[in-house]
Amino acid sequence: MQGRVMPSDYQRIEQAIHWITQHAHEQPELGDLADYLDLSPYHAQRLFTRWAGVSPKQFLQYLTVDFAKKLLDESQSVLSTSLEAGLSSPGRLHDQMINIEAVTPGEYKLKGKGLEIQYGFHETPFGECLVATTPRGICHLAFVSNTGRQAPLHQLKALWPRAQLNGHQKATAELVSRIFSLGPVHVNHRV
């Protein structure tokens, strides 16, 4: 009698990421993922978080916001974007975008019109970075390459062409220090 071959943790996470990506528009629950992986919800949560660095719910939220941004870029309304992304209301999209992007869906759709964004360049253990913030948290982070500061600054301006961009080293320095410290960081809860 041959026993059942158990997939490795790596294979399970690969399957989980693929499955969540394929079912993101359905907004699946942890129990659905656990059933697919043939694990308890507790073990699915722990395994995914350990290997992916975020919970399955957080990963799903990132996918949802990414999809919503594409729809908003195509001039879809916030309501239709929310529904097409599988969310029950625009309020859920609003909360997810604030949490992940530090902007509302409307601010994103209007490319920052009426929004003030502060930015600064700072040294990190990984090289120099540009960090940009709204009053709600980080809306952009990019590392400076060999080509210099112009590329990340140009990228920021392209992402937020209608925002008021203000270079402000001091305002962003403390946040960058917290991000690259050794403790837990919560960056999108008021800077």
Spans of features found by a protein language model:
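Basic nucleic-acid-binding alpha-helical/helix-turn surface characteristic of O6-alkylguanine DNA
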Residues: 1-85, 91, 95, 101-191
